[in-house]
């Protein structure tokens, strides 16, 4: 029987989650805009994730926009103590489906209140600044998140798409619980950010963890997958889980079958030789 076998990490020191989570971007419509074609299926994916032992779900107000958060709030008991939900604010969507950074402190505060209502959570477990806005001083946006934490609106603060320098700047303002950057077995440009997270005991949430379409150049991945009777994507997830103790992969999908395949990857034990070859 498939179940989340990943070990645990304490987000912010007190929110214990299994390290393989679920990213809820794909439960929206095409292009991450609007309602999903099959709302019942989207709800089934969320419910099945929890049944499989996934207790960390990541979303954002820009997914839909608002659709992913609302479906989570309507489908799951978001106040249960054994389910941790992180969301993000600071990206807008336009009619062309562009992703537009917006870090104005007043906007972030209002966005948080809207996320809280959609998710039906008070406080929100983890609130992450989605992407630094070149038109807003980074420190101003982080101070806004610090105020949210001081006011009891959020339990922990995270960052996304940041550098080591920005992480350290933010740490001087408020305790940072997580960083969410692109990282996978095929793309390790942010290895320095991962190392900093390990140093500070900050959770590292690698987005695009499956590296779909980018695995052809990863030496040995198909051979290793065949050895474990697994898919190359399951090996990519297993590698992330074993590469560092602070990684919290959040593979997303709109399919229950794919969800179960992703969760099954948590039981794969790569050998030292296999890890070295993939690395």
Q: Residue spans of the language-model regions?
A:
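A short acidic, helix-capping loop that chelates divalent metal ions and anchors anionic groups
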Residues: 28-32, 92-99, 215-216, 258-261
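Alpha-helix N-cap and loop-to-helix initiation/capping positions
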Residues: 34-41, 67, 71, 99-110, ...
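Beta/alpha (TIM)-barrel catalytic core signal, keyed to glycine-rich beta->alpha loops juxtaposed to Asp/Glu
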Residues: 3, 132, 136-279
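Short, acidic/polar
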Residues: 35-49, 101-119, 163-169
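N-terminal binding-site loop/beta-alpha segment at the start of enzyme catalytic domains
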Residues: 1-83
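Active-site groove signature of glycoside hydrolases
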Residues: 116-134
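Structural preference for beta-strand elements that scaffold enzyme active sites
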Residues: 10, 17-21, 55-56, 82-86, ...
